[in-house]
Amino acid sequence: MNRYLVFLLFLCCLISSCRNRSQIKTSSDLEAETMIPIKDSSYLFNGVSLDGWEITNFGPQGPVSVSGGQIVLGMGDGCTGVTYKKEFPELDYKVSLEAKKVAGNDFFCGMTFPVGKESCSLIVGGWGGTTVGLSTINRKDASENQTTTYMLFERGRWYRIELLVRKDTVRAYIDDKLVVDYIRAKGDVLSIRPEVVLSKPFGITSWYTTAALRDIRLEKLD
């Protein structure tokens, strides 16, 4: 009888141990949980690393990390950002992503992008937190040209941003609302501010602000 009881106790302990082991998550399991689903090659960010990107060496930038399927741009003394290092089109493309402001009072998404052989930047939440527009058009910033508009942005809320670039038009949407509708006039010159030259050809920055980015995609337009 005693041997039988000992055997039963041993069997119970063995079953309990197996259950506990099955509930322990390995580092691979945790990594898989944080990865966003990569449905196709249009995704520029894999959710777990900066593969294809580099931290932009602005100098006084804040820390940059990948956590929970997001690129986190820490608050720096100026620009903090990442630059895409793989091939990028010059025209007829669409970039979409989700961005949120975590802390700070300035832009949480400064997207520098090519327009043919020129470059420009879409600023979301600049100049104190509410300005949206293109920098620069004929040397005028997003706060002072024909694309200037204003929006209130909540901390901790994700905003879906879409940018469509063609030869003579640049359009931007935030949560499906058209916020930039630029049509190039004869003689217009597009350029970028000196602070973000290192973001070329395509990069995303924040300015004195902690920001998070996810679901970054690139699609060709017909």
Question: What is the role of each PLM region?
Answer:
Residues M1-Y4:
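Positively charged n-region of N-terminal signal peptides that target proteins for export
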Residues F7-L14:
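Bacterial N-terminal signal peptides
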Residues C18-D222:
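Carbohydrate-interacting regions of secretory-pathway proteins
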